[in-house]
Amino acid sequence: MPINILSQETVNKIAAGEVVERPLNAVKELVENSLDAFASSITVEIEEAGKKLIRVSDNGFGMDKKDLELSILRHATSKIDDFKDLMHIHSLGFRGEALASIAAVSNFAIKTRKKGENSGWKLSVAGAKDIKVMPWSGAEGTITEVKSLFFNTPARQKFLKSDSTERSRIINSLEETALANYDISFKIFSENKTVFSAAQTDSKTERIADILGKDFAKTLKNIKIDHPKISLDVYFTGRDNSLPNKKYQYLFVNSRPVNYPKRLMHCVYQSYKESIPRDKYPGILIYTDVDPSEIDVNIHPAKREVKFADENGIYDILFKALRNALMSQGHPEIKITYPPLDKEKSAKQEVEGSTAPRFPKIQQPVIYAREPKPKYNYASLKQTCSIDKYADVFAKQEELTPENFDSNIKVIGQVFDTYIIASNKGDLYIFDQHAAAERVRYEFYLSQMKSQTIKIQQMLMPENFDLSPSISELLKANINIFNELGISIEEFGQNSFRITAYPALLGNISMEQIVKTIISDIEDDKHAEIEQKRDKIIRSACRASIKAGDNVSFIEAKKLINDLFKCKQPFTCPHGRPTAYKISLNEIEKFFKRK
């Protein structure tokens, strides 16, 4: 087969596939151009999740006719001049590929007017062909329009997800960009409806509240770390405000949203290791300002990956600051300032080898002192009261079945405010009260749903709550399922909702937290079928049952156990954990050597 030289049109389409994989990439590149043009106000409009229209308007510097004509040429950029500049990148974009790639697969237009000039120019191009430039009389700044994205690459269209999914990806990206650039105003529209609007502010906390919600912003603590080569401004949830998923974890490097390097992600989780449950996650936003020569962003065209020259140094600083803040009770804001670097010492470290840390190690401050605990000789204790040789007695548990029980099960009491002790037919049973209550509620709820007899409790005072724009979109897409299951939710303003009714069987509980937890569960599996989502909602709602630590009366315990054995699957909770543990009289007597 002979070797052929590809046409420029084919080359452009192939290159476009690397830079513009989906509408999200086009939106991201255009918004970054606006930021690099020092815009203080950016408006983004999309239709059909960006496939029909993407329009980005800004009040930045604009372009003259010469720069406008160069802007759509591949590898034409105002950000760098040569390879050396890659080591000192201050802008978000620098490759000179974005506009050429977008123009190759869309009907593309730029309208721009440079600051200080009386008039502007408009450039239009269809699939990198028929380039036209004409005068334009608009305001200072730039408006970029992308219509019929991928009209000439049907294979690319075929691999796009649903409008809901593609729109969600765009909104997620714009949320990150708005969080990173809190000093710029953003207005985001989808199908001519406002998705979110964030006014220009000098407060990161205000922007976090605008995007991620006031309730979340109130839970955040703050530490500031000033170092000669890097500054960190960290907003993080405390020990009592852990989250069900990793949704609220952001890293911004020089105002660029990036993925967490594995090393820094490990640092965050290690900092929280002893502060939150293993199945929970922290919310954390890290804003870093670092010398551009200390990072490498030229790793992937998406510019989501970044390498730090001294990850170990940053790890050390961040870990100690976060760990100390979590251990400390009070003082929501902590500031750590480092002395200027000793240049001679720093140079000596560089000469001695690359393993020398670039960041000076810091002394961990003493939060409080404890008296040393007395040391016990556990070995001698083990010799005198070891139960290892009896461990196998309790390991052999008989299979639990409803047939093992009769109606005369006797509740003995509750221990540790978590377990209910009962006896039946000469055997002893330990019930996990939370797992048992979850199973009872789950099957009652499921039964009422299938028979369409869900009893509704109207709320005297509706519960209002806010969500981030992307989570709002997810709730709107699934709101009918909630309503079918008796959880009545209404839109109540931009990214605000209210709950007006809920299933009576759930009892007197806060529905706001339950709904937020359910949405987090759905987000983890966005592509689940409707039946799976219904089941997920019911399972999540039932988590609000009797908890471990709740004091249960004798009558409540008796009713719970009786209800449990009316269930089809009484011996596991809806999430698969066991509800009961059986110890036979025979096992007990063997342990005490009565047999």
Curated annotation (Swiss-Prot):
Matches recorded under Pfam families: DNA_mis_repair, HATPase_c_3, MutL_C
Q: Give the record's GO CC terms.
A: mismatch repair complex
User: What is the name listed in the Swiss-Prot or TrEMBL entry for this protein?
Assistant: DNA mismatch repair protein MutL
Alphabetically sorted, this entry's keywords are:
DNA damage, DNA repair
**Phylogenetic placement of the source organism:** Bacteria, Pseudomonadati, Elusimicrobiota, Endomicrobiia, Endomicrobiales
Biological process GO annotation list? Answer: mismatch repair
HAMAP family reported for this sequence: DNA_mis_repair
Gene3D superfamilies (UniProt xref): 3.30.230.10, Histidine kinase-like ATPase, C-terminal domain, MutL, C-terminal domain, dimerisation subdomain, MutL, C-terminal domain, regulatory subdomain
Described by its record, this protein's role is as follows: This protein is involved in the repair of mismatches in DNA. It is required for dam-dependent methyl-directed DNA mismatch repair. May act as a 'molecular matchmaker', a protein that promotes the formation of a stable complex between two or more DNA-binding proteins in an ATP-dependent manner without itself being part of a final effector complex.
| Keyword Nucleus recorded | no
Q: So which domain of life are we looking at?
A: Bacteria
Please give the SUPFAM superfamilies that the UniProt record associates with this protein. ATPase domain of HSP90 chaperone/DNA topoisomerase II/histidine kinase, DNA mismatch repair protein MutL, Ribosomal protein S5 domain 2-like
Per its UniProt record, what InterPro entries does this chain match? Answer: DNA_mismatch_repair_CS, DNA_mismatch_repair_MutL, DNA_mismatch_S5_2-like, HATPase_C_sf, MutL/Mlh/PMS, MutL/Mlh/Pms-like, MutL_C, MutL_C_dimsub
Please list the disulfide bridges: none
Concerning its family, UniProt says: Belongs to the DNA mismatch repair MutL/HexB family.
**Origin species:** Endomicrobium trichonymphae
What GO annotations for molecular function exist for this entry?
ATP binding; ATP hydrolysis activity; ATP-dependent DNA damage sensor activity; mismatched DNA binding
